[in-house]
Amino acid sequence: MKTDTSTFLAQQIVRLRRRDQIRRLMQRDKTPLAILFMAAVVGTLTGLVGVAFEKTVSWVQNMRIGALVQVADHAFLLWPLAFILSALLAMVGYFLVRKFAPEAGGSGIPEIEGALEELRPVRWWRVLPVKFIGGMGTLGAGMVLGREGPTVQIGGNLGRMVLDVFRMRSAEARHTLLATGAAAGLSAAFNAPLAGILFIIEEMRPQFRYNLISIKAVFTGVIMSSIVFRIFNGEAPIIEVGKLSDAPVNTLWLYLILGIIFGCVGPVFNSLVLRTQDMFQRFHGGEIKKWVLMGGAIGGLCGILGLIEPAAAGGGFNLIPIAAAGNFSVGLLLFIFITRVVTTLLCFSSGAPGGIFAPMLALGTLLGTAFGMAAAVLFPQYHLEAGTFAIAGMGALMAASVRAPLTGIVLVLEMTDNYQLILPMIITCLGATLLAQFLGGKPLYSTILARTLAKQDAEQAAKNQNAPAGENT
């Protein structure tokens, strides 16, 4: 009898413990799980929208080029049509940005950095359509812009949209989903999941709040974004340069010299971007008519340039494999480099919706290939392959300009599938970053954000000053 009683009591104790465990589980904070679920949703949406953006931009470009092919035998029609088509497409992008969502202009990455610090608003309901359609216009016009900036900003805004749809109010969720969307956006633009994660950790390190949930959320979003991208585009590297040879140890000093060159070029490039922005601001003075006409002229110029020298127009993804293969002479590489520096400054600094990553990668490829070809002539005993310097140069300019060497290294290796070049990449990017910092260069996106915040404060001060006296008393 005592045994039965003891058994019964033991069973009751087990049941009570189970009930207590279930009760504790039910009462536990579900916020981390909810954030991870929403991160998966954000990553999936960003991947879908990123692929859609890529496809629609390609469609617009093909339609424009197809129209030009129809009149290719009639020069008196071809040149004016090339200018008009690109000008009209560009004007659509400039008008939408200026009229409906000024924060959608430019890359959009500084806006996300500002939003992570809660210094810039996130108005996803107007940024998403304007950035998508405006980017279709400017990139479809053949302007020297990349799609990574728009995709990062679109991803961040999708993160805020999902947050609002699920009515989450916690600051942690707001910050985490914004960062998740941005990382997923970069991953969707370049098929580079690890670079997307590093971009948030490295480039946005002052704004990103490190904790276990935020890191897991970023990983989750990037995974989903990459899966969606690969479902639609396959698993091949986004830039096909083939398998390049390894860099022998006795040639590594050349990569350090290349890094020193880019360490000088990066700060100069950043300074030119900022000065060109000031020049455009003085020209249009915020007047929408002047701004749109200016954008149309720049777009039309890119359309004409695409006929004269196709390598000098467009984002640069088509140019990179051709240049890296050594199909141009050193003189032509330097000429295209200078031409694309000018067109990049005109397109990006004018405030067109579009990124600068892809143009910078193309510029790095051009200068890196030129250096590699010159080094091969000067040091024939090394049997150098110019393509390896092209790969190193791709990441070096980004490292010196954006001050994100890890992201630059991993991004280029993921895009080209040449992981054996990681050592020369590290040497080149580290040399470029250290010299750029020594010369006093500032990270491009951080500088643009600081200028945006200064302008925002000045506008707010002007509003307060112009407020009726009755409101101030």
UniProtKB/Swiss-Prot annotation:
Q: Which residues lie within the membrane without crossing it?
A: 109-116, 177-189, 193-201, 387-401, 402-404, 405-416, 417-421
User: Which keywords does this Swiss-Prot/TrEMBL entry list?
Assistant: Antiport, Cell inner membrane, Cell membrane, Chloride, Ion transport, Membrane, Transmembrane, Transmembrane helix, Transport
Residue ranges that the UniProt entry lists as topological domain Periplasmic: 70-76, 233-252, 310-329, 377-386
Which reaction(s) are listed as its catalytic activity?
Answer: 2 chloride(in) + H(+)(out) = 2 chloride(out) + H(+)(in)
| SS bond list | none
List the subcellular locations.
Cell inner membrane
Do you know which Pfam families this protein is assigned to?
Voltage_CLC
Site (Mediates proton transfer from the outer aqueous phase to the interior of the protein) at 148
Q: What is its main location?
A: membrane
Q: Which residues cross the membrane?
A: 33-69, 77-100, 124-141, 148-166, 215-232, 253-281, 288-309, 330-349, 355-376, 422-438
Q: Which GO terms describe its cellular component?
A: plasma membrane
GO MF terms here are: antiporter activity; voltage-gated chloride channel activity
Q: Where is this motif: Selectivity filter part_1?
A: 106-110
Feature type site, description Mediates proton transfer from the protein to the inner aqueous phase: 203
Residues annotated for chloride binding in this entry = 107, 356-357, 445
Instruction: Give the family this protein belongs to, as stated in its UniProt record.
Output: Belongs to the chloride channel (TC 2.A.49) family. ClcA subfamily.
PANTHER family reported in the protein's UniProt record: CHLORIDE CHANNEL PROTEIN (PTHR45711:SF6)
NCBIfam families, per database record: PRK05277.1
Name-wise, this protein is H(+)/Cl(-) exchange transporter ClcA
Q: Which organism is it from?
A: Salmonella typhi
> Lineage of the native species?
Bacteria, Pseudomonadati, Pseudomonadota, Gammaproteobacteria, Enterobacterales
